[in-house]
C-alpha cells in the first residue's frame, strides 16, 4: 500500500471484487459474527476496503498522528495511515467498554466516548486520558 490514507468511511458490505479487500481480524473465542467495512482512499485516489470484526460504530482519521481508529462492537482498531497495517487494538471484551462515538479534534487528537465516559487519545490507543 505505502500511500497515505486520506479518507476513511463506513460502508455497507461491498460486492465481491468491487474493491481490493483486507481483513482485520483478531483471533478470540468471544468474537461476534458481525463485520464492519471501511472504505479507504489514499492520496492517489485509490480506493480499497478493510473488513473489521464487530458491528459498526465509528471511524476517524488523524493526519497529525497518521493513524485511523475504527471502533466496532468487538474492538478498537488502530491502523497506520502510511502502511495500512494494524498497529494496535483494544478488545472490548477486556474492558467491558462499548464505544459509541469517535471523532478528531482540530488539533488532530482522537476523542472517543462510551455511554458514560469520554477519552482523549493521542498517538496510540494506549495514550489515553480519561475525563
Go through each PLM region and give its residues.
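Repeated scaffold domains used in trafficking and secretory/extracellular systems
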Residues: 2-27, 47-66, 93-108, 131
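Detector for Asparagine
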Residues: 28-31, 44, 66, 117
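Short, solvent-exposed loop/turn segments at conserved positions within beta-propeller repeat blades
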Residues: 28-33, 69-71, 112
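Surface-exposed loop/turn elements that mediate protein-protein interactions on large endomembrane-trafficking
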Residues: 35-51, 76-94, 116-131
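Short loop/turn segments that connect beta-strands within the blades of beta-propeller domains
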Residues: 64-65, 72-74, 82, 106-107, ...
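Acidic, Ser/Thr- and proline-rich intrinsically disordered linker/docking segments
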Residues: 110-111, 124
Amino acid at each position: 500500500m505505502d500511500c497515505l490514507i486520506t479518507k476513511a468511511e463506513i460502508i455497507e458490505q461491498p460486492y465481491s471484487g468491487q474493491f481490493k479487500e483486507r481483513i482485520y481480524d483478531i483471533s478470540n473465542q468471544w468474537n461476534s459474527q458481525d463485520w464492519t467495512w471501511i472504505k479507504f482512499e489514499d492520496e492517489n485516489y485509490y480506493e480499497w476496503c478493510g473488513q473489521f470484526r464487530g458491528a459498526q460504530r465509528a471511524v476517524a482519521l488523524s493526519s497529525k498522528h497518521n493513524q485511523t481508529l475504527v471502533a466496532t462492537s468487538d474492538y478498537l482498531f488502530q491502523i497506520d495511515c502510511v502502511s495500512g497495517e494494524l498497529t494496535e487494538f483494544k478488545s472490548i471484551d477486556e474492558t467491558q467498554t462499548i464505544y459509541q462515538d469517535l471523532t478528531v479534534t482540530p488539533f488532530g487528537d482522537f476523542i472517543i466516548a462510551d455511554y458514560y465516559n469520554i477519552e482523549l487519545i493521542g498517538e496510540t490507543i494506549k495514550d489515553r486520558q480519561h475525563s
